[in-house]
């Protein structure tokens, strides 16, 4: 069987979803028009999201009649004509869900209609992402010139771990995403995720946005607080639309309203995880199209715009010492499995010039003594932790650490990149409950000239600029004092002390708003062991 295409070259295949909180609707409707050797079949599957649906087959001996039935059924469910399927969804009707597979096929169909350019041999010997859509002749030339270089087995294992689809699916399931889609490659398109971010921003505005967060600044921060700000509240249409375009599996429970910044932040974390997972899967799928004698994970590693090397035993020991530090409120301990040093990153930060005050010269006779050698000033850089889900690690290695998308009022200090000196704090963001093995990034961060804060401030970046500072340092109650140098940069390792200043924060955070002030130095694989109450008190 093969899917029949319309006059524009797009297949008669569509995935529809409809969520209506008021009626406890959370269902899908799949449609396909198939050619089976001259007979035409319209395949329909409908059911509740997360469960196996009911399948119906409609047979036709005439293609026009089959198309007419397909398009009429599509209009019945969406109130859109087939040629309008890319338009805005109609309220209280099914929405078209754009899958990654459909989006990729569409691009391929369009490229076939365009004239192919003459092959050009790229004389530059560069690493990193290879351009897609290259003509066959060019691929053959590149294949002959491929250097035979075996990658360290540890690196292959690393790539396999961070791109493991089963691990990704486990995390996505925990985030309530509809795992019934199958592998991440069969999930949503990246364009669909962008639409999801936009809807969440609209919902956030409807519950007050930054103004609502400012009104709660004087009170203790509660993770699941529903904002008590006078507003019309989030539109049910927007929430229904979001759930329809980003399908969730809630079983037979009523889909929850997205009516707080904490819930919006949780949904954004889901989209972030989906984005990273889909990007990794698309890369793997693209590699599988080309035959090669190389291991697929070696080829995947070669697409990275950076080099990774296993660290020496000495550095591994120092990183392990740093991981041994645990916050008193954290219920697990960390230990080192492996670590890799990042070399030649895609974006090398420029080192900020150090201002040296000129000492005024004394008048008088010239001294015949030679000047004493100048002692370099102590570095203000620190090695700090950044935690993220395993779904995001490959994307970060490809693109670097990115600033959050949208006006994220759920973040305590605005849209920066967050770092911590206590590793267990960063490990919280790795979703350690889902796996006993997580990945953390140990980053070189410029900590000079910070704006010091003792409570949440969502406009921290604006206050930082007004104060002519270069970063934000959120001072927590517990702060480490002891450090160990790793390749000349201090990293915090132990001896948590309580500061004298009054603060609403438990642990230190460093927030950066300029990419030149941080870079990834080590990718660290960490084992997570949950502690009992007795072990925590010891």
From Swiss-Prot:
Gene Ontology MF term list: NAD+ poly-ADP-ribosyltransferase activity; NAD+-protein-aspartate ADP-ribosyltransferase activity; NAD+-protein-glutamate ADP-ribosyltransferase activity; nucleotidyltransferase activity
Q: What is its EC number?
A: 2.4.2.30, 2.4.2.-
Query: What's the short name of a Pfam family annotated to this entry?
Result: PARP
Give the compositionally biased regions (Basic and acidic residues): 105-126
Residue ranges annotated for the WGR domain, each copy included: 1-94
Q: Residue ranges of region Disordered?
A: 104-133, 357-381
Keyword Nucleotidyltransferase listed? The answer is yes
The main location class comes to: nucleus
GO cellular component annotations of the record? nucleolus
- Quote the record's activity regulation: Inhibited by N-(6-oxo-5,6-dihydrophenanthridin-2-yl)-N,N-dimethylacetamide HCl (PJ34), 1,5-dihydroxyisoquinoline (DHQ) and 3-aminobenzamide (3AB).
Protein family membership = Belongs to the ARTD/PARP family.
Please identify the protein, giving its name as recorded.
Poly [ADP-ribose] polymerase 2
| Gene that produces this protein | parp-2
